[in-house]
Amino acid sequence: MKFVDEAVIRVEAGDGGSGCVSFRREKYVPDGGPDGGDGGDGGSVYLQADENFNTLIEFRFERFHMAERGENGRGRDCTGHSGKDLILKVPVGTRAIDHDTEEVLGDLTTHGQKLLVAKGGFHGLGNTRFKSSTNRAPRQKTLGTPGEVRSLKLELLLLADVGLLGMPNAGKSTFIRAVSRATPKVADYPFTTLVPNLGVVNPRPGQSFVIADIPGLIEGAAEGAGLGIRFLKHLERCRILLHIIDIEPIDGTDPVESARAIVGELEKYSPKLASKPRWLVFNKTDLLLEEELQEKVERIVKELEWEGDVYTISAYNREGTKELALKLLDYIASLPPEDNVVNPDDEVEFKWDNYHQANLDSVNEDYDDDFDDDFDDDDYDVEVIYQR
């Protein structure tokens, strides 16, 4: 199936059902009190993460999604049925963004997690709600409010512990093949990798981590050169980045300039992503003698003014890959568990929340002030007198 990691859809929550104006009419009760019921709430639209999905391709062909409308209220104090909620299944790792405001509504990072993206309309109130000791035959009702409508941008971000960065042909795909069972395409031309790949690495029995390989970056990627930087978003959830550097580029380019270009593109895309822990990994060390290799590594590290971890590997010959995988496993295990709890202060305020609350408060205030605990509909029925 084709890998699609972005889609724009339109979601519409159901409108609330309107309240009903009705009066009790029975035999011998021709002028009964009000009995108009409330309408039903409109259905809301939710996104739900499902581990059985791995692409957003379905949303490319079906862009409009609408929840059910709430039913109107009816007589005899019958409340209308609430509209059925609409639940859209998306892959784990999906991020929902309001396309108009660019507001991030939330991230779905665990199987079964649900996210409200469009809130259903509030039900209208029937005339029963407006009866009081001074208003015996209210003809007021309220209409249901419209459901929320959103233009929604869905982004699929891969969930991985380790992300690979580097120029095209640096050996990223070869490395992921060496340490996992993933089989991305490998060839001797640039941009062999066109979509992200995931691999599960098992350095020790019962212990593993996930590694992500994305298409290579080149200088000017932020302006759209090459495949651009659209795939960098898949590294946002990684806990550590491996910067793969070709120690002996076949085209004669300077590894120092290539490394600086990658860091520059990373900072242009996201300073937060650029600040993630990053290790330098020199690949294709089998092309140099050991003395020459050591000298070249020291020179590059010095010119880059690099003070972090440095590793040398040959992904093709699988030299140093096992040791690097073990180091990564120990590092990831030493990190505190990720906190995916949503901060209440960061919760999205939906467009109709204030309206709903104000409407309720207004009705409740009137209702509480005027309502008589001893009020009885029968007190205001027509008195029937039988004469002989």
Curated annotation (Swiss-Prot):
Keywords: Cytoplasm, GTP-binding, Hydrolase, Magnesium, Metal-binding, Nucleotide-binding
Annotated localization: Cytoplasm
Chief localization: cytoplasm
UniProt cofactor(s): Mg(2+)
MF annotations from Gene Ontology: GTP binding; GTPase activity; magnesium ion binding
Ligand binding (GTP): 166-173, 191-195, 213-216, 283-286, 314-316
UniProt KW Cytoplasm keyword: yes
Domain (OBG-type G) ranges: 160-333
Biological process per Gene Ontology, one example term: ribosome biogenesis
Domain Obg: 1-159
Enzyme Commission number(s): 3.6.5.-
Residues that hold Mg(2+) according to the record: S173, T193
An example Gene Ontology CC term for this record: cytoplasm
Similarity field: Belongs to the TRAFAC class OBG-HflX-like GTPase superfamily. OBG GTPase family.
Main function: An essential GTPase which binds GTP, GDP and possibly (p)ppGpp with moderate affinity, with high nucleotide exchange rates and a fairly low GTP hydrolysis rate. Plays a role in control of the cell cycle, stress response, ribosome biogenesis and in those bacteria that undergo differentiation, in morphogenesis control.
Subunit structure: Monomer.
Protein name: GTPase Obg
Organism of provenance: Shewanella sp. (strain W3-18-1)
